Amino acid sequence: MPDRSLPPAQRALFDALLDHGLSEWVARLPAQLADGLDRKRFGDLPAWEKAVAKLPTLPEARDVALDSDSVRVDLALTESQQRQCENLLRKLMPWRKGPYTLGGIHIDTEWRSDWKWQRVAPHLSPLEGRRVLDVGGGNGYHGWRMVGAGAAFVLIVDPSPRFYYQFQAVRHFVGDADGWRTHFLPVGIEAVPPKLEAFDTTFSMGVLYHRPSPLEHLMQLRDTLRPGGELVLETLVVEGDANTVFMPGERYAAMPNVYFLPSSKALAHWLERCGFEDVRVVDEAPTSLAEQRSTEWMTFHSLADFLDPEDATLTLEGYPAPRRAVLVARKPE
């Protein structure tokens, strides 16, 4: 049984995994949490932890909207409380995924993640009552939206401790309004027990191109799903036929860890070779400068700075500019 002295969010995660029959994972959680939140590995972690801990006690009465473009929590804050909250939330910058509106504080994130959700959501099997895994889920924006769409249990796994504390900050505002259905574990997919076959839907959005072994990643995703479960895959692609795969040099759009960019047709073939059925390309389009940009909450360089200033169809390195595709596939029964 979980230690009752754990922070509420961690205790809720233990309880949820037990409730969903994932006791094998529960045994691994203490070590995974200790590793993912290791102060020796992450020098800024104490500052993020302190910022979340200093958020003030909030009024019980609140209106929480997890199904709106901006994940929103409306509650009555004094001017002093709102100023304190905003200062603490800014200590967790940069905020990359969102947007959020928390107690009247609008967090205008680098990515308009709501636009991605609008492209993805119409093509999903209904999430009502489903168990969902969100691999590389950032600070949890899409996880909240999944619960807003009716998911019974959402587990976000992402190895970034900054994202973990951004999620916990949002959790502070949401409170228990989601019925403790949304959870975050600061680990990568490698920490998911092998052959788990526990989730009805698994998302991997913005992860595949960071993987030096993309087929291994697809098979890891497959093994998280129950028979008949659904995979939602979003990644960078290039234009071309079923044999087109591009591997950039040291950097792509200034990112150092980008490996394989297939065409959407090649990616569909990869999914089929990895044992998926009913593979569909449901969306494909260039990433727009309006969707990814610098803001007051993410003040560093963004997409506009990574493109050729003379030709926005090319990256700084001369490669095709970012283009993303969404594919949906099913694991056989």
From Swiss-Prot:
Q: InterPro entries attached here?
A: CmoB, Mo5U34_MeTrfas-like, SAM-dependent_MTases_sf
One Pfam family cited in the UniProt record for this chain: Methyltransf_9
This enzyme's EC code(s): 2.5.1.-
Functional description taken from the UniProt entry? Catalyzes carboxymethyl transfer from carboxy-S-adenosyl-L-methionine (Cx-SAM) to 5-hydroxyuridine (ho5U) to form 5-carboxymethoxyuridine (cmo5U) at position 34 in tRNAs.
What residues bind carboxy-S-adenosyl-L-methionine, as annotated? 97, 111, 116, 136, 158-160, 189-190, 205, 209, 324
List the Gene3D superfamilies hit by this protein, alphabetically. Vaccinia Virus protein VP39
Source species, please?
Chromohalobacter salexigens (strain ATCC BAA-138 / DSM 3043 / CIP 106854 / NCIMB 13768 / 1H11)
Q: Which GO terms describe its biological process?
A: tRNA wobble uridine modification
| Catalysis: reaction(s) | carboxy-S-adenosyl-L-methionine + 5-hydroxyuridine(34) in tRNA = 5-carboxymethoxyuridine(34) in tRNA + S-adenosyl-L-homocysteine + H(+)
GO MF annotations, alphabetized: methyltransferase activity; transferase activity, transferring alkyl or aryl (other than methyl) groups
Family recorded in the similarity comment: Belongs to the class I-like SAM-binding methyltransferase superfamily. CmoB family.
Q: What protein name does the entry list?
A: tRNA U34 carboxymethyltransferase
Query: SUPFAM superfamilies in the record, alphabetically?
Result: S-adenosyl-L-methionine-dependent methyltransferases (SSF53335)
The residue ranges crossing the membrane are: none
Which gene is transcribed and translated to give this protein?
A: cmoB
**What does the subunit comment say?**
Homotetramer.
Instruction: Recite the UniProt keywords alphabetically.
Output: Transferase, tRNA processing
